[in-house]
C-alpha cells in the first residue's frame, strides 16, 4: 500500500516536537519562568509529541500485515533500538529503562488484540472511555513515583512493571493513543465528527481547569501535584492530549507536505535515536535566557 505523505508529515511533526521538548528539558535554566506565554506554548506543544507519535503508530499499524514472526522480529528490533537510545542518553536513562520504543515493541506484539477493539465504532469509543475511567479511578502509574523511580530497573520485576504500568511510557494507559489512531484509520470520521469530538474534550479540559483553580493546584506539570500530569499520564492528560492531537490531525490530514516535513517522518526512528547524542554531550552546558 502506498505511503501517505500527510501521515508521514504528522510523524515528522511529532519527531520535531519531541526534539524540541527534550532540548528544552536539557537546557532550560532553572530560574526560567514556567508561566510565560512562550514557556506554556513550548510545554503544551512538547506534551503532544509522544501522544501524536503513538497515535500515528496506531494508524500505521492498521495498514500493516501482521504476522507472529514479523511481530517478534519487530519486537526484538525496537527493544534493541530502545537500549541504543538509553546508551546514547545515560544522563537520562538506565541501559534497560523502558521507553517509547519499547512501548511500540509491546504494542505491535499485541496489535491483534487492540485492533479488534478499534474495528467497531462502539467498541472503539467504549475502549477509550474505559481506559480513561480506569486510569482516573485507580491511576496504576502511581503519582508518588519520582523520575528516578520510573527509570530504575534493578530487577526483572521492576522492568516489567515499568513496561506495563509504572514507567515513562507504559503500555497502560498509552495504549489509549494506539487504539485512537487505529480508529481514525478504520472509521475515517469526517470533519464534523472530529470537531464534535474536539468540542466534547475541550469542555472536559475546561472543567479540569476549573477544578485546578478550586483545589488551588497547578493545572499542568510534568509530574507532582497538578490536575494534569505527564508522568504518570493521568486522565486529564489523556483528554488534553486527545484534544491537541485531534486538532493537529484536522490541520494536517490530506494536506500537501510542508517543506519536506514528510521526509522527516520517514526517518523518524533514526532521528529519534540520534537526537539524544548531542543532548548528552551538551547536557553540561549551562544556558541563561529569559522566557
Predicted feature descriptions by range:
Residues 1-291:
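Alpha-helical transmembrane segments and their immediate juxtamembrane cytosolic regions
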Amino acid at each position: 500500500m502506498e505511503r501517505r505523505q500527510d501521515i508521514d508529515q504528522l510523524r515528522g511533526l511529532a519527531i520535531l516536537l519531541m526534539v524540541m521538548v527534550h532540548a528544552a528539558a536539557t537546557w532550560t535554566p532553572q530560574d526560567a519562568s514556567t508561566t510565560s506565554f512562550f514557556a506554556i506554548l513550548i510545554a503544551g506543544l512538547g506534551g503532544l509529541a509522544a501522544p501524536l507519535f503513538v497515535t500515528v503508530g496506531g494508524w500505521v499499524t492498521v495498514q500493516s500485515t501482521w504476522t507472529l514472526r514479523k511481530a517478534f522480529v519487530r519486537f526484538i528490533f525496537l527493544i534493541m533500538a530502545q537500549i541504543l537510545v538509553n546508551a546514547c542518553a545515560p544522563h537520562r536513562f538506565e541501559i534497560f529503562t523502558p521507553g517509547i520504543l519499547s512501548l511500540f515493541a509491546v504494542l505491535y506484539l499485541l496489535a491483534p488484540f487492540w485492533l479488534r477493539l478499534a474495528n467497531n465504532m462502539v467498541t472503539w469509543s467504549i475502549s477509550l472511555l474505559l481506559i480513561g475511567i480506569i486510569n482516573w479511578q485507580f491511576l496504576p502509574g502511581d503519582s508518588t513515583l519520582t523520575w528516578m523511580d520510573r527509570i530504575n530497573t534493578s530487577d526483572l520485576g521492576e522492568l516489567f512493571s515499568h513496561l506495563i504500568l509504572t514507567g515513562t511510557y507504559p503500555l497502560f494507559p498509552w495504549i489509549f493513543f494506539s487504539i485512537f489512531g487505529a480508529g481514525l484509520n478504520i472509521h475515517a470520521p469526517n470533519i464534523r465528527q472530529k470537531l464534535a469530538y474536539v468540542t466534547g474534550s475541550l469542555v472536559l479540559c475546561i472543567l479540569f481547569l476549573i477544578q485546578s483553580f478550586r483545589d488551588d493546584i497547578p493545572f499542568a506539570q510534568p509530574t507532582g501535584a497538578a490536575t494534569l500530569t505527564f508522568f504518570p499520564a493521568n486522565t486529564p492528560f489523556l483528554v488534553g492530549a486527545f484534544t491537541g492531537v485531534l486538532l493537529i490531525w484536522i490541520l494536517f490530514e490530506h494536506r500537501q507536505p510542508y517543506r519536506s516535513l514528510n521526509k522527516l517522518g520517514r526517518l523518524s526512528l533514526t532521528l529519534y535515536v540520534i537526537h539524544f547524542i548531542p543532548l548528552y554531550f551538551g547536557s553540561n552546558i549551562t544556558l541563561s535566557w529569559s522566557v
